[in-house]
Amino acid sequence: MSHPYSPSDLILPDFTPNLRSTSEVHAWNGIASFLVMFIIWRISGRSPRKLSKTDRWLMIWWAVSGLIHIIHEGYWFFSPEFYKDKSGNYFAEVWKEYSKGDSRYASRHVAVLAIEGIAVIFVGPASLLAMYAIAKGKSYSYILQFALSLVQFYGSSLYFITAFLEGNKFACTRYFYYSYFIAQGGTWLLFPALIMIRCWKRICAACLLLDHKTKVY
């Protein structure tokens, strides 16, 4: 059966179309994300450390980010033939839908496979560790967040650059190009960049304070 992806000559044997509508896929994604956000916000609000709102939002970011890497991207990484799924599996439906904006997920493009493999195995678990570090006020919190954000920013940069170098031909329509490839993909550039700036300032301030104390004593 023919597929909706670009380029049209992409070979996907036994392709099975989505059994769920686009709105249904987005609705389930939204519900799951909101539930995680709600739980983390409530838990962080009861922390004896009296976390700032920024730290609480960062905990949400790392929780959602980590779960996406481990669960959503983990499913894709270990399910090379998700596009054949006939059961209506939620995760298969998500990736069939997202592939309309970037068919490299359906074709298992080596660049995407490498980037997502690192995200699934390393970045996902480390993101949950970053959430824990913020909650407990661990000394490694800022350096861990900076390192993770740098990896996410670098991986997302490669994600976009490799697509551009190959002619930006992987979205089936301009709508999916901008809403999926650009908007959703760009999230992994914007938020990591903002977190890196914040962590950089905090780390530099801590180093200056340490230098000052060293000179005093």
Swiss-Prot record:
Protein name: Isomeliandiol synthase MOI2
Main location per the UniProt record: membrane
Keyword Membrane: yes
Biological-process GO terms, alphabetical: sterol biosynthetic process
PANTHER family to which the protein is assigned, alphabetical: 3-BETA-HYDROXYSTEROID-DELTA(8),DELTA(7)-ISOMERASE, STEROL ISOMERASE
Annotated tissue distribution: Expressed in maturing fruits and in juice vesicles.
UniProt KW Transmembrane helix keyword: yes
Chain's role: Isomerase involved in the biosynthesis of limonoids triterpene natural products such as limonin, a compound with insecticidal activity responsible for the bitter taste in citrus. Catalyzes the conversion of 7,8-epoxymelianol to isomeliandiol via skeletal rearrangements.
Subcellular location: Membrane
Gene Ontology terms: cellular component: endoplasmic reticulum; membrane
Source organism of this protein record: Citrus sinensis (Sweet orange)
Superkingdom, taxonomy of origin: Eukaryota
Pathway the protein contributes to: Secondary metabolite biosynthesis; terpenoid biosynthesis
Membrane topology type: Multi-pass membrane protein
Reactions catalysed: 7,8-epoxymelianol = isomeliandiol
Residues passing through the membrane, by range: 25-45, 58-78, 110-130, 143-163, 177-197
Pfam families tied to this protein: EBP
EC top class named in words: isomerase
Lineage of origin: Eukaryota, Viridiplantae, Streptophyta, Embryophyta, Tracheophyta
EC number: 5.3.3.-
MF terms in GO: C-8 sterol isomerase activity; cholestenol delta-isomerase activity; steroid Delta-isomerase activity
Keywords: Isomerase, Lipid biosynthesis, Lipid metabolism, Membrane, Steroid biosynthesis, Steroid metabolism, Sterol biosynthesis, Sterol metabolism, Transmembrane, Transmembrane helix
Domain EXPERA residues, every copy: 54-196
Protein family membership: Belongs to the EBP family.
